[in-house]
Design a protein with these regions (language model features):
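Conserved donor-binding/catalytic core segment of Leloir-type glycosyltransferases
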Residues: 5, 186, 190, 196-215, ...
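Aromatic "clamp/platform" in nucleotide-sugar-dependent glycosyltransferases that forms part
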Residues: 289
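A charged, aromatic-enriched C-terminal amphipathic alpha-helix characteristic of glycosyltransferases
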Residues: 343-379
Length: 383
């Protein structure tokens, strides 16, 4: 069985780092019958300093069949350790998640090259999108300039999830040695339609995302200011407050609402709990500035719930598919759509839910995607 050595800043049981953790967890869940995974990660949750209590640090932990995880402490991360792990595992592939981490992106590339690993993959995980680079842009642009100057990414294979991400990589990195395009895996799950009552002119909306500029939380809240007073909206926010100043701006908007709009900040929840929570709402409301994949969008479909999202994600033409809306970032467009959904009768709303579930079924039962990954890790052919 071929061995894949993975480097990622945060991994399960952590969940607060969002999409990259979910992407890697789903990949392992779908492929661990075909490959042995060795995952190197931090022994702490995102933005926390206390180590996990249910893992053993600085040694391999049995995580799942054919999956081992090495949770390393802050004082242990080094080029020397990474080289030692590479020598002990003898991987066929080194697979690196992310771009801007010195310890879990740059050092692993250096270690793998020094140990003459034949195949090194980098998955940017959306970090080279314009919306992502725009956050703390000066630091990121300097970082990328240094990687180009030092030719860090020479002779690296890239894993992008779609053509748009491929264009982002070429625009920021330059000429690439090799690229594979393979979409993210969904969470493994049994899908079913659990209906929800749809009272006239009343909506329960939810968002599962960091409270941060790139997720456009402030825009979402400002959009609600334009919703008609005839519509009653309850909007629950799940996610980490990433920036206190940004959250204060959000609270300033919330303070302006009339009685028909109610916003609740719920806080951070484990991503494993998301599917069971979404079906208590009528729709996901997430007008983010950009998503490389948007796991929570797919999970809304898996819960048979439509979405109201921006047109800056891979999930497009949703109104045509009668499964939701993907809109340009214009506040009044979102407000009118919320009013439209609120006025929708039960039978029409149920059609939206069923169509959302159909999108999920197509994504979950995608044998071609599994074949694409198998070929990606086994073959040298570039496509």
């Amino acid at each position: 069985m071929r061995k894949i050595l993975v480097f990622i800043d945060w991994f399960l049981p952590g969940y607060k780092a969002g999409g990259p953790v979910r992407s890697m967890a789903n990949m392992v869940e779908h492929l661990n019958n075909d490959f042995s995974f060795y995952i190197v990660t931090r022994n702490t949750e995102y933005l926390e300093t206390e180590p996990y209590t249910d893992v053993i640090s600085n040694q391999w932990n049995d995580f799942a069949p054919n999956v081992k995880v090495f949770y390393t402490g802050n004082n242990k991360k080094s080029l020397r350790l990474w080289r030692k792990l590479i020598r002990s595992v003898k991987p066929d592939v080194v697979y690196i998640n992310g771009i801007y981490s010195p310890y879990f992106s740059i050092l692993p590339i250096r270690a793998a090259k020094l140990e003459k690993v034949d195949r090194i993959y980098v998955a940017p995980r959306g970090m080279l999108a314009a919306s992502a680079i725009g956050v703390k842009s000066f630091r990121k642009k300097i970082f990328l300039a240094i990687t180009r100057l030092l030719r860090i990414y020479d002779n690296i294979e890239w894993h992008t999830t779609n053509e748009k991400e491929l264009r982002n990589v070429i625009e920021t990195i330059g000429e690439l040695s090799s690229v594979r395009i393979a979409d993210n895996f969904p969470r493994k799950a049994e899908l079913s339609f659990i209906p929800i009552d749809k009272a006239p002119m009343k909506l329960r909306l939810c968002s599962f995302a960091r409270i941060a500029p790139e997720k456009n939380t402030l825009f979402a809240l400002q959009s609600l200011l334009s919703v008609s007073g005839k519509v009653s909206v309850e909007f629950d926010l799940y996610g980490q407050i990433y920036d206190a100043d940004y959250w204060q701006k959000c609270k300033n908007v919330i303070a302006q609402y009339s009685e028909n709009i109610k916003v609740n900040y719920i806080g951070v929840i484990n991503s494993d709990d998301v599917p069971g929570i979404i079906n208590a709402y009528h729709a996901l409301f997430l007008p983010s500035r950009g998503e490389n994949f948007g796991h929570v969008i797919l999970e809304s479909f898996m819960a048979a719930r439509p979405v109201i999202i921006s047109d800056q994600t891979p999930w497009r033409n949703l109104e045509e598919k009668q499964a939701g809306w993907d809109l340009p970032l214009v506040e009044t467009r979102f407000a009118k759509t919320i009013e439209q959904l609120a006025a929708m009768p039960q039978n029409e709303f149920d059609v939206l839910c069923q169509n959302a579930l159909s999108i999920a079924n197509e994504a979950v039962n995608n044998e071609r995607l599994i074949s694409t990954y198998k070929n990606m890790f086994k073959s040298w052919e570039v496509y």
